[in-house]
């Protein structure tokens, strides 16, 4: 098997490397952006890669009629809802980019199906199980958890799923070592099962907005403090986000992150 590398520059000047594998005279490419492997000689492979690439990089198309706009009850504000929205309550923000945050309605099959497609993407990137959606997708799951998405220019570019926690699952995690603190049982309210932002929109504060939206809307009538929000086995990037969002410095000098099993 031979391995060749095709080098090019991206629009931001970074050098990209596209790997080319020759297996039994069949060329297999690895996309330097979405990291999918495919055969450029296969029509099906090329089509599959095009769809996969667009979803991972730019997000998923989203109907303007899907989801319930999320309100900040402390300021009577609809979070990131465009001025053209039929929902006129409160003050809108981020109108110029046509951005909004909505909650998935578990009794709407089209919304649930679309969200499950997004979760496929999320779980592929995180190498996480694909069967952890029942707490937000079942019609009787009102008080078990919620799924929330961030929409920009009619595409879902970010998503979060949160679940109501049972106290025996709550722990503190030492950020530097990724180990749990023994014999301490803190009390947290919401667990972040998944959080994701498409690659083209990372570093723009979308993850933090999703976290805030989840805190104020996941439990009806309750605005959850950010220190009551726990993380589930965060990835490297997730750990950095957790440290920034609600990590606390212990007297030992270590950073502690609220997490759950």
UniProtKB/Swiss-Prot annotation:
GO CC terms in record: chromatin; nuclear replication fork
This protein's record includes keyword Glycoprotein: no
Domain of life: Eukaryota
Pfam families, per database record: Acetyltransf_13 (PF13880), zf-C2H2_3 (PF13878)
Major enzyme class: transferase
GO molecular function: chromatin binding; protein-lysine-acetyltransferase activity; zinc ion binding
Domain N-acetyltransferase: 102-261
InterPro entries listed in its UniProt record: AcTrfase_ESCO_Znf_dom, Acyl_CoA_acyltransferase, ESCO_Acetyltransf_dom, GNAT_dom
E.C. number: 2.3.1.-
Subcellular location: Nucleus
Keyword presence, Zinc-finger: yes
PROSITE patterns: GNAT
Assigned keywords, A-Z: Acyltransferase, Cell cycle, Metal-binding, Nucleus, Transferase, Zinc, Zinc-finger
Protein family membership: Belongs to the acetyltransferase family. ECO subfamily.
Task of the protein: Probable acetyltransferase required for the establishment of sister chromatid cohesion and couple the processes of cohesion and DNA replication to ensure that only sister chromatids become paired together. In contrast to the structural cohesins, the deposition and establishment factors are required only during S phase. Acts by acetylating the cohesin complex component SMC3.
Identification of the protein by name: N-acetyltransferase ECO1
Organism: Candida glabrata (strain ATCC 2001 / BCRC 20586 / JCM 3761 / NBRC 0622 / NRRL Y-65 / CBS 138)
Lineage: Eukaryota, Fungi, Dikarya, Ascomycota, Saccharomycotina
Gene name of this polypeptide: ECO1
């Amino acid at each position: 098997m031979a391995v060749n590398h095709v080098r090019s520059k991206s629009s931001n000047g970074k050098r990209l490397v596209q790997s080319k594998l020759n297996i039994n005279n069949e060329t297999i490419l690895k996309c330097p952006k979405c990291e999918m492997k495919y055969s450029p000689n296969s029509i099906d492979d090329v089509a599959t890669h095009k769809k996969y690439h667009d979803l991972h990089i730019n997000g998923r198309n989203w109907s303007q009629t899907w989801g319930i706009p999320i309100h900040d009850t402390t300021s009577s504000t609809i979070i990131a809802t465009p001025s053209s929205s039929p929902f006129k309550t409160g003050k809108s923000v981020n109108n110029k980019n046509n951005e909004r945050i909505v909650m998935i309605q578990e009794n709407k099959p089209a919304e649930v199906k679309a969200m499950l497609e997004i979760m496929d993407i999320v779980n592929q990137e995180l190498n996480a199980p694909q069967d952890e959606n029942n707490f937000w997708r079942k019609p009787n799951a009102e008080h078990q958890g919620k799924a929330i998405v961030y929409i920009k220019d009619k595409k879902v570019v970010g998503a979060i799923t949160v679940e109501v926690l049972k106290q025996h699952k709550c722990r503190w995690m030492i950020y530097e070592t990724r180990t749990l603190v023994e014999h301490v049982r803190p009390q947290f309210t919401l667990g972040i099962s998944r959080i994701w932002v498409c690659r083209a929109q990372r570093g723009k504060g979308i993850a933090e907005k999703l976290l805030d939206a989840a805190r104020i809307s996941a439990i009806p009538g309750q605005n959850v403090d950010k220190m009551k929000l726990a993380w589930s086995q965060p990835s490297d990037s997730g750990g950095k986000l957790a440290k920034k969002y609600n990590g606390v410095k212990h007297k030992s000098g270590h950073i502690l992150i609220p997490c759950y099993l």
